[in-house]
Structures are given as C-alpha cells and as structure tokens.
C-alpha cells in the first residue's frame, strides 16, 4: 500500500531516507554529520534511495 499523501511522504523521507551511512561500520548518521558517531571515520555516504 503506497503512501499518497505528500505530507506523509515528506515525513517519511526525512525520518527514513535522509541519513548518511558509514562505509566502515555501517552506522546511520544524520545528514549534517561529518564524522561517524560510532567509529569516528570521515568516510560517509548518503543513504541510497529507491
């Protein structure tokens, strides 16, 4: 059942998709992060979106 309400889609994207993933340990970090919260690596990438 897909979400059709644009307001709910925006909330979903903000809460689930707008993250950075550490390439070293796989931890999820906020988009504003420059270093990983778990291992302090600077090797971060944006989470892939379908």
Swiss-Prot record:
It comes from the Archaea. SMART domains: Ribosomal_L40e (SM01377). GO terms for molecular function: structural constituent of ribosome. Pfam families: Ribosomal_L40e. GO terms for biological process: translation. Keywords: Ribonucleoprotein, Ribosomal protein. GO terms for cellular component: ribonucleoprotein complex; ribosome. PANTHER family: 50S RIBOSOMAL PROTEIN L40E (PTHR39649), LARGE RIBOSOMAL SUBUNIT PROTEIN EL40 (PTHR39649:SF1). Belongs to the eukaryotic ribosomal protein eL40 family. This is Large ribosomal subunit protein eL40. It comes from Aeropyrum pernix (strain ATCC 700893 / DSM 11879 / JCM 9820 / NBRC 100138 / K1). The gene is rpl40e.
């Amino acid at each position: 059942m897909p979400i059709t309400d644009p307001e709910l889609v925006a909330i979903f994207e903000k809460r689930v998709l707008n993250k950075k993933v550490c390439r070293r340990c796989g931890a999820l970090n906020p988009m504003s992060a420059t270093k990983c919260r778990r291992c302090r690596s600077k090797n971060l990438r944006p989470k892939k979106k379908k």
